[in-house]
Amino acid sequence: LSLAANGTDSFLVDPLARAARGAVAAGIVVVASASNAGKSDSGAEVYGAISSPGIEPSVITVGAANPKYTAIRSDDVVTQFSSRGPTRSGLRLPNGKRWVDNVLKPDLVAPGNRVLGAVANKKNMAAPNGNVLATLYPSLMEGAQAQGAAQVVNEELMELSGTSVAAPAVAGAAAVLLQANPGLTPPLVKAILQYTAQPLPDANLLQQGAGQLNVEGAVRLAKSLRTDIAGALAAGTLKPGDDLLAAGQSLPVASSTLNGQTFDWSRIAFAGGSHLVSGNALFTDFQWIYDPGLTWVRRIALRNT
């Protein structure tokens, strides 16, 4: 979802968050952009600016990283514009006190700075299907050409930036995981993506979440797990502590090598809104947090339908 609705309502009552939570409960992996409010007009870093539905704990909320025009990942950084956590939405309790969600977000980051994308055929604003961005900001196409785009007629490319550019990469990764293992539940997809993410140096949890998207590692971990998890859970035959590993499988080595560089996975996932969880048991044993119908944030637990 490329949505960034500004609002102050808690995920408990926010309409977009409730709709996303219902979709997750139905077995749909929901990916949302974090928003682009990580920097104030004066250039100061801003925390607590995650937008809805990215405020929803069950959603995979994605921030943007800057790959700096290189294939290697050691120089990647979180973009200045990418919204930082935690969520600051809330509600007024019956006793008059204000509840603030304070959910750890974003969940991870993906490339979202000057990424090449397709341009609509007609770039004239007055023409049908005109590409307003390309017309107003021709430098976006010039930047693509500088990256090597041939700019053939009807095949033009432009540079795009934003968490709305990063989120589709994670949505695609989630689809690849479900292709590799159709038995994954949405919370398990999220945990795998976080656990296998690459931590970026000099970035904290509220800037990068668990780290940068690592599809290679995520697929390896997904393939090591049973392919009947979602079905067994729906049938009521899977309970906390049951074996998650597929027959004859063991957990993969918790590192990846991409473009000649080896890095360790983050080996963390978010749970309960503000908790970090780790350890092999996250994926060797079934955890109740992998039930898509449950939402747990601090002292609140919801059964979603």
Regions found by a protein language model. Give the residues of each.
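C-terminal substrate/ligand-recognition segments
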Residues: 166
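Conserved A3 ("GATE") glycine/threonine-rich loop of ANL adenylate-forming enzymes
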Residues: 36
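Topogenic and prosegment regions of secretory-pathway hydrolases and membrane enzymes
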Residues: 3-7, 11, 15-33, 43, ...
